Amino acid sequence: MGCSLSGLNAFYDAVSGGGDVWINENRFRIVRQLGEGGFAFVFLVKEVVADGLARKKSINPSHISDDGTYAMKKIIIQTEEQLELVRQEIRVSSLFSHPNLLPLLDHAIIPVKGMQDGLLKHEAYLLFPVHLDGTLLDIAEAMQLKKESFTTITVLHIFRQVCGGLKHMHSFDPPYAHNDVKPGNVLITHRKGQPPLAILMDFGSARPARKEICSRSEALQLQEWASEHCSAPFRAPELWDCPSHVDIDERTDIWSLGCTLYAIMYGTSPFEYVLGESGGSLQLAVMNAQVKWPSGLNPPYPESLHQFVVWMLQPQPAARPNIDDIIIHVDKLITKYSP
């Protein structure tokens, strides 16, 4: 983290139209933009000098691209609060090492002058392995349009991998919660003759999971934080309406996992249906765990998967399973439904 001359070069090259970005000692050429949101842009980039990253001892060799292409996230930072949030994301991302969690390969935060006001601001560049098949959300939406769906065993294999990544986070001391588990934060890579590879990403909302709430003020602060960092259709009830005296823990992620399993099957959160109803309230649907199942004579998935979702979507956190319980259960289902 921090600033360097090479980091400043990233700014000047971009302004002059060179299309090259330096992240510390490695230079990357921007190939094309992959996406954007808020103050962040994601680009497909390619190493200008081959094998530059391969010489960094801190990077797992399995994360080095064969063709030198990577994903680069550029974040425009305008306030000190935003700067601290980016630093927090970098710190947290650097903690994790698991096949189903997206690794942060390198990063740089650089000072730049604002183009209009001339004030000193910052830009952050975060480098990751690239997964061009898109997110689980992208794929699920495309399949819904074509009236297609994953097979039961593929649903379970994808879900099992997300659980594996989350278990790694929950196993820290103290445990970390992701706080924004959803299909849009799961990258998918198709593999010939194997189930798709699923990788949980975006640790901008990840924090130590356990927090003691001792007052109404603290409860309201948590609700406000959750409204900004936890996607509403996948947000646990205790983050919508937090009691004044309660212990919050990693079971907020378990609720989101239940919503995600539903979404892998049906392409949407189990509660978003209310947004299409007159006077419908997403918060009330979540607080009451009002899951709406698709109707039809021939449901595409067995009742055991529906029961699995319901097990995770318990309004009271103490009634939800932990990640180890979930993994044991999904492994049993994989054995049951394997061809």
What do these predicted regions represent?
Residues 1-23, 31:
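Juxta-kinase regulatory segment immediately upstream of eukaryotic protein kinase catalytic domains
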Residues 31-38, 42:
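Protein kinase glycine-rich loop
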Residues 103-122:
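Short beta-strand micro-motifs within the conserved protein kinase catalytic domain, predominantly
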Residues 118-135:
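Conserved short submotifs of the Hanks-type protein kinase catalytic core
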Residues 170-190:
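Catalytic-loop of the protein kinase fold
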Residues 184-230:
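Activation segment/activation loop of eukaryotic-type protein kinase catalytic domains
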